[in-house]
Amino acid sequence: MRIEEDLKLGFKEVLIRPKRSTLKSRSDVELERQFTFKHSGQSWSGVPIIAANMDTVGTFSMASALASFDILTAVHKHYSVEEWQAFINNSSADVLKHVMVSTGTSDADFEKTKQILDLNPALNFVCIDVANGYSEHFVQFVAKAREAWPTKTICAGNVVTGEMCEELILSGADIVKVGIGPGSVCTTRVKTGVGYPQLSAVIECADAAHGLGGMIVSDGGCTTPGDVAKAFGGGADFVMLGGMLAGHEESGGRIVEENGEKFMLFYGMSSESAMKRHVGGVAEYRAAEGKTVKLPLRGPVENTARDILGGLRSACTYVGASRLKELTKRTTFIRVQEQENRIFNNL
């Protein structure tokens, strides 16, 4: 046993210090990034935000809607091959280039992902997702996927420390997914005591990944557009959003009605709700590590997407970054004990 004395920070414990700017308008900010990935050699350009691979967020409808904003969607792994075929048949190449195919690490997952990728060469992203990316089996699966799909861009996670980022990149991952426990419907930190404050995880993992020519995606912990800006400021190449995109028409959650008002269910993928839906229930040897919440219906996701992108542009203008790429170089974090004036929050 040992204790690390270094202070670790989350998004709510910092603000970004404003700096002199020559920008005249938020419209002057370029949010599009251009990437060439380490292992796949593929090039991609777009806004580096990803809708999370949750079945109440990462749906085909969400992918179609967010593609118009140049935003990626990690489509959840529970669609059948036949459903994928129908989606591909009805989608343009522009939509497909904004889609990630999500998978677990079982042999059945591998075979299903292979069938999906074979449906259309425009599917260039694979998202290998497990709750605990520290297992040897997971690393071996990433290496197996890289060997099987040498030209596909592989995103793999989740981890929160630099040495594991390095191992995954060396095993074939182009992008490492960073975050354990920060999600709005994740209870891993409560059930297990395991986790890492998200901003510090992003800063440390970005440093490790960039040293090897890899990239990271900050996954979880964002509740406002300002948090998205902080993640990019901390060095994230991509930011994945779940709760901020939940509850919309495209989100796919079940709608329930209480006292004449309609709500949409949103739950973590390790929650009892998710396990009952997809594997018949919670196995006797494990605990659920997610919760289910009821969200008021939020309408089309396009309004939320515009709000997020608008906040991100505004953050860039406050620090003088004319491009999103420059934001991390222009970011100085200050530690704070309050974020906002909350006097009217309950009204």
Swiss-Prot record:
Entries under SUPFAM superfamilies matching the protein: Inosine monophosphate dehydrogenase (IMPDH)
Gene3D superfamilies assigned: Aldolase class I
Top class in the EC scheme: oxidoreductase
A GO molecular-function descriptor: metal ion binding
Positions that bind K(+): 181, 183
Any one biological process term the GO annotation gives: purine nucleotide metabolic process
Keywords: Metal-binding, NADP, Oxidoreductase, Potassium
Annotated EC: 1.7.1.7
Active-site residues annotated for this sequence: 186 (thioimidate intermediate)
GO CC annotations on file: cytosol; GMP reductase complex
Enzymatic reactions: IMP + NH4(+) + NADP(+) = GMP + NADPH + 2 H(+)
Subunit-structure text: Homotetramer.
Task performed by this protein: Catalyzes the irreversible NADPH-dependent deamination of GMP to IMP. It functions in the conversion of nucleobase, nucleoside and nucleotide derivatives of G to A nucleotides, and in maintaining the intracellular balance of A and G nucleotides.
NCBIfam families: GMP_reduct_1 (TIGR01305), PRK05096.1 (NF003470)
Protein name, as recorded: GMP reductase
Species of provenance: Shigella dysenteriae serotype 1 (strain Sd197)
